[in-house]
């Protein structure tokens, strides 16, 4: 399966881990999707989910200056997760920033409010500079 589908599963895993009553570990959360999606790139999913969780404070510090009158805590959970995922991938992978940004915009269109993809794209455009 494609990286795009793996990013969707990474997003859903991170969303699940953000639930207030969740005591799941990263490996437990990922194991829930393995049975239904054996063709996903689980190495990539684990790398992305672990990287975002392990570097959350640094990612938030990187993102915050570009939020214009917003704070990380005030963002929708979906937007916060997508920004963290994309920022981590831009900073820690060889994937071209343009590809990562496009995937983040597509995730936003799929999982967030109508026009939030413009906000996500604007923040990520500043981060990649």
Swiss-Prot record:
Keywords in alphabetical order: RNA-binding, Transcription, Transcription antitermination, Transcription regulation
Pfam families reported in the protein's UniProt record: NusB (PF01029)
GO biological process: DNA-templated transcription termination; transcription antitermination
Lineage top rank: taxon: Bacteria
GO CC aspect terms: cytosol
Keyword RNA-binding: yes
InterPro entries assigned to the protein according to its UniProt record, in alphabetical order: NusB-like_sf (IPR035926), NusB_fam (IPR011605), NusB_RsmB_TIM44 (IPR006027)
DNA repair among keywords: no
GO MF annotation, one: RNA binding
Similarity field: Belongs to the NusB family.
Physiological role: Involved in transcription antitermination. Required for transcription of ribosomal RNA (rRNA) genes. Binds specifically to the boxA antiterminator sequence of the ribosomal RNA (rrn) operons.
NCBIfam families on file: nusB (TIGR01951)
UniProt-recorded name of the protein: Transcription antitermination protein NusB
Organism: Staphylococcus aureus (strain NCTC 8325 / PS 47)
């Amino acid at each position: 399966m494609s990286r795009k589908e793996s990013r969707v599963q990474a997003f859903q895993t991170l969303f699940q881990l953000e639930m207030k009553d969740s005591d799941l570990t990263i490996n437990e959360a990922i194991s829930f999707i393995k049975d239904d999606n054996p063709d996903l790139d689980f190495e990539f999913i684990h790398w992305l989910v672990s990287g975002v969780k392990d570097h959350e404070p640094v990612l938030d510090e990187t993102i915050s200056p570009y939020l214009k009158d917003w704070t990380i805590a005030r963002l929708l959970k979906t937007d916060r997760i997508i920004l963290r995922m994309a920022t981590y991938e831009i900073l820690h992978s060889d994937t071209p920033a343009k590809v990562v940004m496009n995937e983040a915009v597509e995730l936003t269109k799929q999982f967030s409010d109508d026009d939030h993809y413009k906000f996500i794209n604007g923040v990520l455009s500043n981060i990649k500079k």
